[in-house]
Amino acid sequence: FNGQYCCHNSYLLNDVLRGEWGFDGVVVSDFGGTHDTQEAIDNGLDMEFGTDLGSLEAFQNYRLGKPYLKLLKQNETSEKVLNEKVRRVLRMMYRTNMSEGRPWGTLASEEHAMAARKIAEEGIVLLKNNNKILPVNIGSLNRILVVGENAVKMMSRDGGSSEAKSKYEVVPLEGIRKYVADRIEVDYQPGYSSTASKSVNDSLHTEAVKAAKGADIVLYIGGMNKNLHMDCEGVDRESYNLPYEQDALIADLSVVNPSLVAVMVCGNAYAMPWHKKVPAIVQAWYGGTEAGNAIADVLFGEVNPSGKLPFSFPVKIEDNAAHAFNAYPGDGETVEYKEGIFVGYRWFEKEKIKPLFAFGHGLSYTSFDYGKITLDKKTIKSTDNITVTIPITNSGNREGAEVVQLYIMDMESSLPRPLKELKGFKKVNLAPGETVKVNFTIGKEALSFYTPERHEWVVEPGKFQILVGTASDDIRSSATFRVER
């Protein structure tokens, strides 16, 4: 950033992190992210993680190892700075590991499994559910066909530094069969393979489509994996489309069986040329050790989905700002972020580009009605808070959770600003027919923006609009207020 690596950037670490934010903890580099010993010493780096100096087994051969020691012995750097680094490391140790009351703890316990399952369940996003095909009604079916390699693929492993050595992992097919038990037949066809030749994949494709003709419902479980050029570190994706010709497979499955549910296991957005042909789409992400159980719970209605998208799904890759400006991938050394502050949904709204699925989108098996926003005041000073209240009602026939999202529009800013920005969200659980009042407190932090010339956050006087809804493209109520000088 501005000529210095971020791991030892004076402005970011000394001025902003420690100065402006008052951070007194430890700064650890990214793996191999330290490139200059003197800058690392002076600019706030405390611990170096990984290095490009020699082999990884050379314990002292780090930029904050032998080179730092040499400078200290030659009195070319201050011991005072070293002492501050040591103090911060010791402070971290006492805050975490060295408390007298620290419990022994457990690993991979039943409580951990329950927590993992709940986290996975709450993160699953129901993108589409035409004709209420979900949840699956087992009582009306005789045969379920599961298609897709990700139905049987363990995802906690691989992926570079995101790899986890888990005690176990419930894959989706296992979770589905465990839930269904012996009530109905569950068949499986891979449909494709991430390691097979094209001729083998063609055969897998044909067999899956053939099997789909005789199924009451098809649960397609595909997406991506942790292989290179997918959801893996170090290399970018080569295409916005799904790999292994999955788009063609999904389209062919939809022709022979309209009762098709696409469950996508991946950590990223992707093109969906088949989305109009598939009545239900579920974004399951990488759900961890309990992924299979969580997916089954949502598909069969034991859990009402309540996840929301943390980013927009563009229709095509060119809709993204980086590609619209032709700024990606840069010249191999430098990438210029020409979109500025207009990132994600801010870019789509500025350019009036309709995404495939918007930021914050996520459906439920029930429905929620939003009432009218009320404000505790209509005019405030820049240092005041304002309380926003909105009633939310579960108007459906089953319990569910809704993530209420609050956005703010700066209507009179002196600088270009996004149409609106997310400034708060709350998740509320509601029984059928229940109404709760959801409150938000908005203050200086939510109303301010950063001015590069003044190097500070400011709240300008003027008119602001509060917008509350169930997604960035589904605003249900709004109200305005003014900030005075």
Task: List each language-model region with its residue ranges.
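C-terminal non-catalytic regions of proteins with extracellular/luminal or membrane-system context
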Residues: G3-H8, R18-G22, V28-T37, G65, ...
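Catalytic core of the metallo-beta-lactamase
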Residues: Y11
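Short acidic/histidine-rich active-site segments
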Residues: F23-E57
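Long, well-ordered, tryptophan-enriched scaffold segments
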Residues: G44, E57-E100
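Compositionally biased, low-complexity linear motifs
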Residues: L45-D52, L56-F59, I373-L375, K444-Y450
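Short glycine/proline- and acidic residue-enriched helix-loop micro-motifs
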Residues: R102-E110
